[in-house]
A protein has these predicted regions:
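Low-complexity, acidic/polar, glycine-enriched regions of mature
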Residues: 2-236
Length: 236
């Protein structure tokens, strides 16, 4: 009789473990859905409704809000990797500041500062992971891009169509600085200059590590998505 009772307890225990295991397995897609998704991407410059330039290029330009769809925004795009599945996700912020100098048709100096503490995706849980675990914004609240070599702007059209300019600068994330040499699209739209580009980076070079306690691994290579509106008044 005692042996029979022990066997019954064993069966009940195993059955209970199976139920719990199945329940946890069923929850995995729900957890993944909470932290994964396309995110909020900083899209490239849109020249569809751009107007001819109304302001001389030479002078001091400051980061402005811009006009939809070309508002100032900086963000990231990375792949998230799960067993048998790879999805792309993005985050962005419109908390961008800075200034550049144009002299004799050349961009001679400039720095763009991005407030990372307000970066958002499309999931609150992932927002917290990005800010606190990936970017550690409590210690590194800002990222910067500083121009280190002059760039010729003389070939940028002033008729509201896109031009391309190669910019050389230093990108700093989490206190780690790497040189960037990157072609950017440049648009003169009325009183604004819009600068846009996707900078490919290896997150490991900037000390951005994938935490263990998140639902998906993060690909090493991704993009920093940049779209910055500049004006001489800084108000538009």
């Amino acid at each position: 009789m005692k042996k029979l009772l022990m066997n019954q307890k064993l069966v009940i225990t195993v059955f209970s473990v199976l139920i719990v295991g199945l329940a946890l397995f069923a929850l995995v897609p729900m957890v993944v859905a909470l932290v994964m998704g396309p995110g909020v991407r900083t899209e490239p410059v849109n020249a569809e409704n751009a107007e001819p330039a109304t302001t001389e290029a030479n002078g001091e330009w400051t980061v402005a809000q811009g006009r939809p769809p070309n508002t100032s925004s900086v963000g990231f795009t990375f792949d998230e990797v799960l067993p048998g599945e790879r999805t792309r996700t993005s985050g962005s912020t419109q908390d961008v500041s800075g200034a550049v100098t144009v002299e004799e048709g050349a961009l001679t100096a400039g720095e763009i500062v991005v407030d990372l503490t307000n970066i958002v995706t499309d999931r609150d849980v992932r927002d917290e992971n990005v800010r606190n675990k990936l970017l550690e914004t409590h210690d590194y609240p800002e990222a910067t891009f500083e121009i280190t070599e002059p760039a010729d702007l003389s070939e940028v059209p002033d008729d509201g169509t896109l031009g391309e300019v190669e910019l050389t600068g230093e990108l700093t994330i989490k206190g780690n600085t790497e040189e960037v040499v990157q072609p950017f699209q440049v648009l003169r739209d009325g009183e604004l200059i819009i600068v846009s580009g996707d900078v490919v980076i290896d997150r490991n070079e900037y000390g951005v590590e994938s935490p263990e306690m998140i639902a998906a691994d993060i690909a090493d290579e991704g993009e920093i998505n940049i779209r910055v509106a500049l004006s001489k008044g800084g108000q538009e």
